């Protein structure tokens, strides 16, 4: 991976004002949309076991998915006459939808969030709405819920730096909406100090964390998901003294979580969010990014599907267990995670299907296939769609790219497996 040096600015500042270009392979993006000074290597680049990347051993008893195994023959929900994959796109209608909110779906009373917000059964369903647009927050969430005709269990929001405290008043309102309560997933990326500096007690960062802890204790006592610097793989620089080694990240993550908890923030449920980009996950430093079981409650990963043949083109199994010919020892992220973190629930923290004018029917087909495939992935306990009309390269992940894709996504969201009663109160 090449590093584009930015003259006349310090390394810490340069990394503080950029976001990860995860869209290139996983699609993960920061809502601010500032380009990161890194570029990804091609899919055929070096990095196989022969060049030092680790060999991963998996235990099938932990829930490992054999990609060659046939799928169960019975679909999770009847097709109900959904049209076949179209050959031409039906564009999404623009403009605000002013229809009333859809009623919350009928929940399975036996499926509800439990300890550390892990569902007793089923999978939490959520969204990061309106990314890379002016319409974010409650407005974007309401629009997404109207068009998909269901309530979202998780609302994913992004924060950076030391100026804004969270959850914000708007986010608290989203979580506490009467009869439509939601779980917050708050994503914080520190700026102004390197990982190493934060881990060693950077004064400015510590002062912010102390203010943040006071704010949370005073204003929000419900449980919420929390992550620190998601997709950090894209920022790792394995050079002594860089301040951004994998070990630096693990120590920084520990420092942030432990400082917040030491100051009374006992309601955060931590998610370590990986970038599921195969060349990164097979690096020798990848496992060293783990901060420790005591500060990580969930394992998350960001991954996106592509509608055109090539890298990332396929179904849900490909999305969750993406492999690469040049990295033959990598079993796929899901398989790796259930082996490496067998006792941790998994969250797909960002996912979506990039649209294509050449292959507009792929998105609807992906959602229909997903309905049959998702029950196989027993360790997935939450999925959060990243909904944007355009990422930094103009790629569209909206579920309503075509009429058929919206219909398929609506049916997907109403499957029994995605019906979980949200209870975010501290036990």
Predicted feature descriptions by range:
Residues 6, 47, 52-67, 71, ...:
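Aromatic-rich peripheral "rim/lid" segments of glycoside hydrolase catalytic domains that contact
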Residues 168-189, 304, 308-354:
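Glycoside hydrolase catalytic-domain groove-lining segments
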Residues 20-168, 422, 426:
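Boundary/entry segment of secreted carbohydrate-active catalytic domains
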Residues 212-246, 270-274, 383:
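Active-site groove signature of glycoside hydrolases
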Residues 1-25:
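Secretory targeting and sorting signals
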Residues 117, 122-219, 362, 366-380, ...:
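N-terminal carbohydrate-binding/catalytic regions of secreted carbohydrate-active enzymes
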Residues 127-129, 260-284, 342-356, 382-388:
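Aromatic-lined carbohydrate-recognition surfaces of secreted/lumenal glycan-active proteins
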Residues 151-160, 186-190, 286-324, 386-388:
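Aromatic- and acid-rich polysaccharide-binding/catalytic face
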């Amino acid at each position: 991976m090449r590093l584009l040096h930015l003259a006349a600015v310090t390394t810490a500042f340069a990394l503080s004002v950029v976001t990860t270009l995860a869209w290139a392979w996983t699609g993960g993006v920061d809502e601010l949309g500032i380009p990161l000074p890194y570029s990804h290597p091609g899919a055929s680049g070096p990095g196989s076991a022969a060049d030092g990347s680790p060999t991963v051993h998996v235990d099938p008893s932990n829930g490992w998915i054999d990609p060659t195994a046939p799928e169960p023959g019975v679909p999770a929900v009847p097709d109900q006459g959904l049209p076949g994959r179209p050959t031409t796109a039906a564009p999404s209608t623009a403009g605000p939808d002013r229809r009333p909110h859809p009623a919350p779906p009928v929940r399975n009373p036996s499926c509800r969030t439990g300890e550390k917000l892990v569902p007793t059964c089923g999978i939490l369903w959520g969204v990061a709405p309106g990314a890379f647009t002016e319409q974010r927050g409650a407005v974007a969430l309401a629009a997404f819920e109207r068009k998909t005709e269901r309530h979202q269990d998780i609302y994913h929001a992004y924060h950076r730096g030391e100026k804004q405290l969270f959850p914000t008043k708007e986010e608290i309102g989203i979580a506490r909406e009467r009869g439509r309560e939601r779980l917050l997933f708050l994503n914080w990326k520190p700026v102004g100090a390197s990982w190493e500096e934060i881990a060693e007690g950077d004064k400015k960062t510590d002062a912010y964390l102390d203010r943040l802890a006071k704010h949370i204790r005073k204003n929000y006592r419900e449980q919420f998901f929390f992550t620190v610097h998601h997709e950090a793989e894209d920022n790792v620089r394995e050079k002594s003294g860089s301040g951004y080694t994998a070990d630096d990240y693990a120590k920084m993550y520990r420092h942030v979580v432990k400082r917040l908890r030491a100051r009374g923030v006992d309601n955060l449920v931590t998610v370590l969010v990986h970038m599921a980009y195969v060349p990164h996950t097979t690096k020798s430093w990848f496992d060293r990014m783990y901060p420790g079981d005591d500060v990580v409650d969930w394992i998350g990963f960001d991954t996106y599907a592509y509608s055109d043949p090539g890298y990332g083109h396929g179904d849900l199994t490909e999305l969750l267990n993406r492999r690469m010919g040049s990295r033959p020892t990598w079993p796929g992220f899901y398989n790796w995670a259930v082996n490496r973190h067998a006792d941790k629930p998994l969250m797909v923290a960002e996912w979506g299907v990039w649209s294509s004018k050449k292959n507009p029917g792929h998105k609807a087909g992906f959602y229909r296939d997903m309905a049959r495939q998702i029950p196989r992935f027993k360790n997935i306990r939450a999925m959060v769609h990243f909904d944007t009309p355009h990422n930094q390269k103009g790629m569209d992940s909206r579920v309503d790219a075509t009429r058929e894709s919206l219909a398929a996504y609506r049916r997907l969201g109403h499957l029994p497996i995605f019906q979980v009663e949200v209870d975010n109160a501290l036990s």
